[in-house]
Design a protein with these regions (language model features):
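Function-determining surface determinants
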Residues: 1-322
Length: 322
């Protein structure tokens, strides 16, 4: 078992040259590229999803592996999930290849095994680099391809930083450099989450009420606020209706307000002043009734380096205080 610690970015513009320039300025240990095909499995009644597990078979020309990912945490684009890998023979994963204790019982495991079916797939080109950075080894992967489900397909264009060894502070420091590429933003949704939705098996993104945080400490309040903020950022980007976008912006501002309120209970974090400034800027955008200028401005903001770095700073603070 390993706990995968990674930071994911969604890419919205051509970063080929700027990424190449960045890579030329840091220490590359090795690099390669590979075409990957992934098929995700669950039962027709989504028993694995209810257990907060994701199961796939990944193949390339000379490689096949089954992976199960268990319940983890996503905060500010930082994904931390236990995962287990095993060789695979055939077209259906064998759950007995994984540790018994990750399942509620062997009877449950065997029942799920008998009902496994393919639900969706992802196919992409992965270019990856192993990087020596600030005393750590970090893998940078650039995935470009598509997710295919029964309801259609959607593009994959993602950067992922995975900590292989060393301290997570180096991971965040390199993520800050990537934010400077422009046209990238932190991604809280995994390929599997997006795939379930494309297969008609996951709930569509929707507006959510701010969570009740009475009786929890400041760090948990900040976590809740950041998650609320990022959820509605993604919702905003997926909507075309201006009214839905205005409602999403209201929720983004509420999430940020919760983070600011909770941070005020502490010795002021270094990112607090920048967040207050950002909150004021969003308040001005919320008052703008001119279409489509305010929407264009907000879309650009979501991909701006200083905006992404602010979210990264909050996520890094949360990781350091956990």
């Amino acid at each position: 078992m390993q706990t995968e610690i990674e930071i994911k970015f969604f890419v919205s513009q051509d970063i080929q040259q700027s990424l190449s320039n960045l890579l030329n300025s840091i220490g590359i240990i090795s690099n390669a590229q590979v075409e990957l095909g992934n098929v995700y499995f669950d039962t027709p009644t989504l028993d694995l999803r209810r257990l907060e597990m994701g199961l796939r078979i990944r193949r390339s020309d000379d490689f096949a592996e089954q992976t199960i990912k268990c319940r983890g945490q996503v905060v500010g684009g930082l994904h931390a999930r236990p995962e287990y890998n095993a060789p695979v023979h055939g077209d259906v994963p064998m759950l007995s290849a994984f540790p018994d204790d990750i399942f509620p019982s062997l009877a449950v495991r065997d029942e799920i095994q008998g009902k496994l079916v393919a639900q969706f797939r992802t196919d992409f080109l992965r270019r990856h680099w192993l990087i020596a950075f600030e005393g750590a080894e970090i893998e940078l992967a650039w995935d470009q391809g598509e997710i295919v489900g029964s309801l259609g397909k959607t593009a994959i264009n993602e950067l992922e930083l995975e900590l292989k060894s060393g301290d997570a502070s180096a991971l965040f420091a390199l993520a800050e450099r990537l934010a400077g590429l422009g046209g990238v933003r932190l991604g809280a949704q995994s390929k599997a989450q997006r795939g379930y939705r494309l297969a008609g098996l996951g709930k569509p993104l929707a507006l959510q009420s701010l969570p009740v945080v009475n009786g929890v400490d400041a760090a948990m309040r900040i976590t809740s606020g950041l998650q609320h903020w990022q959820h509605h950022e993604q919702y905003w980007l997926e909507q075309a209706d201006p009214e839905q976008r205005r409602l999403a912006l209201q929720e983004i501002r509420q999430g940020i307000a919760l983070v600011i309120e909770a941070a005020g209970m502490l010795v002021a974090p270094t990112w607090l002043d920048a967040l207050i400034t950002q909150s004021a800027h969003l308040a001005l955008l919320a008052q703008d009734v001119v279409e489509p200028e305010w929407q264009m401005a907000l879309s650009a903001l979501f991909h701006r380096a200083e905006y992404v770095r602010l979210q990264l700073a909050i996520a890094a603070w949360l990781h350091a205080t956990a």
